[in-house]
Amino acid sequence: MKNLIAELLLKLAQKEEESKELVAQVEALEIIVTAMLRNMAQNEQEMLIRQVEGALEGVKPDASVPDHDTELLRQYVKKLLRHPRH
């Protein structure tokens, strides 16, 4: 029983580490996108935003992806492009 608990704790720690790495990657990408947008002229920003939004509209998610997840992604992309972090 102790071995099972130890094994589960180890797996949990590994998952937590993977989660931290993913959060760091997402935050790094947010910083990069924000910096890129800030260094673009307003008309270039708008053109890029329209292209990204248009590309998202044309994408049909796999049937196994829940609608909620798809909508969450769309909202996050919109927030990142239209309201970048400061």
Curated annotation (Swiss-Prot):
Gene Ontology terms: cellular component: cytoplasm
Pfam families: Anti-adapt_IraP
Induction cue: By phosphate starvation and limiting magnesium, via the transcriptional regulator PhoP and the alarmone ppGpp.
Classification via InterPro entries: SigmaS_Anti-adapt_IraP
GO biological process, alphabetically ordered: cellular response to starvation
Cellular compartments annotated: Cytoplasm
Entry keyword set: Coiled coil, Cytoplasm, Stress response
Coiled-coil annotated residue ranges, if any: 1-36
Main location group: cytoplasm
Record family assignment: Belongs to the IraP family.
Quaternary structure (record): Interacts with RssB.
Role this protein plays: Inhibits RpoS proteolysis by regulating RssB activity, thereby increasing the stability of the sigma stress factor RpoS especially during phosphate and magnesium starvation, but also in stationary phase and during nitrogen starvation. Its effect on RpoS stability is due to its interaction with RssB, which probably blocks the interaction of RssB with RpoS, and the consequent delivery of the RssB-RpoS complex to the ClpXP protein degradation pathway.
Protein's UniProt name: Anti-adapter protein IraP
Lineage: Bacteria, Pseudomonadati, Pseudomonadota, Gammaproteobacteria, Enterobacterales
